[in-house]
Regions:
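Accessory beta-strand-rich segments of carbohydrate-active enzymes
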Residues: 4, 8-17, 29, 41-43, ...
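Substrate-binding/catalytic cleft of secreted carbohydrate-active enzymes
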Residues: 335-585
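Short glycine/proline/serine/threonine-rich loop/turn segments at secondary-structure transition edges
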Residues: 83-86, 127-131, 144, 205, ...
């Protein structure tokens, strides 16, 4: 294949009224650089932000130039003489969402509406040697009744960019050439089935040709070679072959081995050659568990919501995706779910190299609960989404990382349509596992291989729905859900704990997007006098969120034969009214809460687990059960648990045992303490914090009855109980932080609490500078009062971390009646 690169400067003509129907010859226009978007080229309505702090402003970053209408691009191209008689294709790697093409004044084919795969136009016979004018009409309007929620088409994520990104080129092949190659590894791992589609220039008569195959390993060594004669009698001839591949190396997260299939097609004087990378792997379900090449796997995942804060459109080069997806691997994860969108080729190639298991979706999030159409409300859904699913399968199906497919996110409506799509694609392409939709517990259909939801058979499978149980001990699991669900279960969008936003990121938005939502957050904080506390707020809320993420993850790991979990998410989501739920920001940078090594200790392939109460007295024993989540490269053998219990730097107890049980007296403590329990198995270790309270009689405290008495004790010092009635403005407290976004799901709840752990009032009460489970009951039964704005004299012992939309500083004052 020869390539004629069309990147560079085109001419642009805007069409906000959608009044132009044809190019009308050559025209002058504004310069437009491809690859790129209208926003990057300064085309559209400039964004004017004047300081609003309303919910719409807080929705998401916005393009600096907005354009939602048809857009025309034009340029000349010089076709060399040796292109005569060749097959020519225009390749546009990614367009949002529709394109039409003219060569000179001739329209080529029909409008392509496609969000997930390249737009291609067959120009064979249309581009003779010499100069021609190419004209593109792009259209980013919602032509498919998608609504505005799916990550693949939403102002919350990519925004409605318009342009062409990635490769933009003319591809020139011989008239007889290989149009497509699909590789299907066999379950026995010693052969592959190869399906070729060859374009033939003389379909009016039978012809003959040869297809020669070579399979090379990662070092370039030829491991299989085969030649086949084929009879050709149609313009796109499909042939099926089986190639032996003995002693194949499997592709997986630990050994992401890939092979290269070289396909050479000869027909008369035409010779065409193409390369296809693939991995030897077979995914299956057995006994409600995932198996990859006969070995059980467990998914530890996060979600990618198509947020690209500098460009507003997906990265199209592999290096960018190696960095983006490599972060998930660095943090111990082996799985990424693409939320209501399908990434470009470069993402799959990077995941293949990294050994990541991908779940891919169409740009489909349709249900009336979020004020958009439901599945099937528009007749276009029936034809478009089936074709979209088939296109995704064909375009990216050879990638070994592409293990799971869902039609989209949280879909409701015509489930028979989703069933038709799933059954049809699964019948054609069995290389992955399928489910109707991500989320929503529903009666499972025969075409579904797994369930991804937050309820399974009516049972919750994320801690959001069982926080009280999780607070009692470290033993929560989802065994009931596994027992009552006939397929593997993946817990859906685990976490969503709001961390106070870091508005310092505003300076990092140096590209097409302007973070007016973060500018509004900053203004609200400045108005409330808390902007200078933002880093302390991030530390306190982030550490609480990290604690809760750890509990969520470990509940999944403790559940025997559980399919896995998907976090929402490792990184912030800056749309949907600003959901800063990540331990990393939207640029993939750490917030300084946990390092990758610390996170991997409880989210990696091998994780020691500890089941025990969280709160004890000094008269009790620490009774605990030990176990190992063991999904490493090889099963651990002859387990020995190395247990160290520390109070600060001092070792309280150290035990090595092969028995998975602990029975340790706590009577050696004569004071209240927080103990850090570390369990190590080989080179893997994990830690938990438990709280031990001295078994001492309650000490009676005087009760303050009037404001004057309260003022006196504040002046002279001392301890007293202050009833809530003395505070005119009572704000309920909470332990679990705001879910997702306090604007998307309106909430006045806090995001944690800052604690002056060294204050004498907390003497004898073990605590860090942020909340842990020993605070849960106290906070949930407490009220807070507001601190006067900019009152430096008030130094609270506890201060709530406010959510960014309800910013007045306030601190817990005592238990409610």
């Amino acid at each position: 294949m020869k390539i004629l690169d069309l990147r560079g400067t085109w001419r642009c003509r805007t069409d906000e009224a959608a009044c132009f129907t044809a190019p009308d010859g050559r025209w002058e226009g504004s310069p437009f650089v491809l690859p790129g978007s209208a926003c990057e080229n300064g085309i559209g309505t400039p964004l004017h932000y004047t300081g609003e702090t309303d919910p719409d402003t807080l929705r998401a970053p916005r393009q600096r130039y907005a354009y939602l209408a048809p857009l025309w691009l034009q340029r000349e191209v010089d076709i060399p003489a040796d292109f005569a008689g060749q097959a020519v294709t225009l390749f546009l790697e990614r367009v949002n969402m529709a394109s039409r093409l003219w060569v000179d004044d001739l329209e080529i084919g029909r409008q392509i509406v496609e969000l997930s795969a390249p737009h291609t136009y067959d120009l064979t016979g249309k581009l003779t040697p010499g100069r021609h004018t190419l004209t593109l009409r792009l259209d980013n309007r919602d032509l498919l009744s998608l609504g505005d929620m799916a990550s693949g088409y939403s102002p919350d994520t990519q925004d409605y960019w318009i342009g062409v990104v990635g490769r933009i080129e003319l591809q020139i092949c011989p008239p007889c050439h290989v149009a497509d190659v699909q590789v299907y590894p066999a379950a026995d791992s010693v052969r592959v089935r190869v399906v070729t589609a060859c374009n033939v220039h003389s379909p009016e008569r039978q012809d003959s040709g040869t297809l020669r195959f070579q399979i090379a390993d990662a070092d370039g060594g030829i491991v299989t070679e085969q030649q086949n004669s084929v009879r050709l009698f149609t313009s796109k001839q499909v042939n099926y072959f089986t190639l032996p591949l003995p002693n194949a190396h499997h592709w997986n997260e630990f050994t992401p081995t890939q092979y290269t299939l070289v396909t050479e097609f000869r027909c008369g004087d035409d010779v065409d050659c193409t390369e296809t990378k693939f991995g030897m792997r077979c995914i299956a379900v057995q006994d409600k568990k995932f198996y990859l090449d006969g070995r059980q796997i467990s998914l530890r995942g996060t979600i990618d919501c198509a947020q690209f804060p500098l460009t507003g459109y997906p990265a199209m080069d592999k290096d960018a995706w190696l960095q983006r997806l490599g972060t998930a691997r660095e943090y111990g994860l082996n799985h990424v779910r693409f939320h209501a969108w399908c990434p470009p080729e470069a993402a799959f190639a990077a995941a293949d190299e990294l050994g990541l298991y991908l779940s891919v979706e169409m740009p489909l999030w349709l249900n009336r609960d979020i004020h958009v159409p439901e599945v099937g409300d528009d007749p276009a859904h029936r034809s478009y989404f089936l074709q979209e699913a088939l296109t995704i399968s064909r375009a990216y199906g050879n990638h070994p990382s592409f293990l799971f497919f869902s039609n989209g996110n949280e879909n409701l409506g015509d489930f028979s349509l989703l069933e038709e799509i799933t059954a049809a694609v699964k019948a054609i392409d069995p290389r992955r596992l399928y489910t109707l939709t991500s989320n929503f517990d529903h009666p499972l259909l025969p075409c579904e291989d797994y369930l991804c939801a937050f309820l399974a058979a009516g049972h919750p499978v994320r801690i959001q729905h069982c926080q009280d149980r999780a607070a009692e001990n470290t033993a929560l699991d989802y065994a009931d859900a596994v027992a009552d669900t006939p397929v593997p279960v993946i817990s859906f969008e685990v976490g969503q704990y709001c961390v106070y936003p870091d508005t310092d990121c505003i300076a990092d938005y140096s590209g097409a997007m302007r973070p007016i939502n973060f500018e509004a957050v900053r203004k609200l904080a400045q108005q409330s006098g808390v902007h200078e506390k933002r880093q302390a707020y991030i530390h306190a809320s982030g550490n609480l969120a990290a604690k809760l993420y750890k509990e969520d993850i470990e509940a999944a790991l403790r559940t025997r034969d559980f399919g896995g979990f998907e976090l929402l998410s490792l990184t912030d989501y800056t749309g949907q009214k600003t959901a800063t739920v990540g331990l990393l920001d939207v640029f993939g940078r750490s917030k300084g809460i946990l390092t990758a090594d610390e996170f991997r200790r409880f989210a990696g392939p091998v994780v020691p687990l500890f089941k025990a109460k969280r709160i004890f007295t000094t008269t009790e024993f620490l009774d605990a059960a030990l176990s190992l989540y063991d999904f490493g490269p090889e099963p651990m053998q002859d387990l020995c648990y190395d247990v160290t219990i520390r109070e600060g730097d001092a070792v309280f107890c150290h035990i090595k045992t092969r028995k998975p049980m602990l029975h340790i007296p706590l009577s050696g403590l004569d004071h209240s303490a927080q103990l850090d329990v570390t369990v190590a198995v080989g080179t893997y270790s994990n830690s938990w914090r438990i709280f031990v309270f001295a078994d001492t009689p309650d000490t009676a405290l005087p009760t303050v009855h009037t404001p004057a008495e309260l003022e006196k004790i504040c002046e002279t010092g001392g301890r007293a109980l202050v009833p809530r009635e003395l505070f005119p403005e009572q704000i309920p407290c909470n332990f679990v932080p705001v879910f997702w976004s306090p604007v998307f799901f309106p909430s006045k709840a806090s995001c944690g609490v800052m604690i002056n752990a060294a204050h004498p009032a907390l003497q004898g009460f073990p605590t860090k500078a942020y909340a842990d489970y020993q605070w849960k009951e106290l906070l949930e039964n407490a009220v807070a009062f507001c601190i006067p704005k900019n009152d430096k004299a008030v130094q609270p012992i506890l201060e709530n971390v406010p959510n960014f939309y309800d910013n007045p500083p306030h601190h817990p004052a005592g238990r409610s009646a």
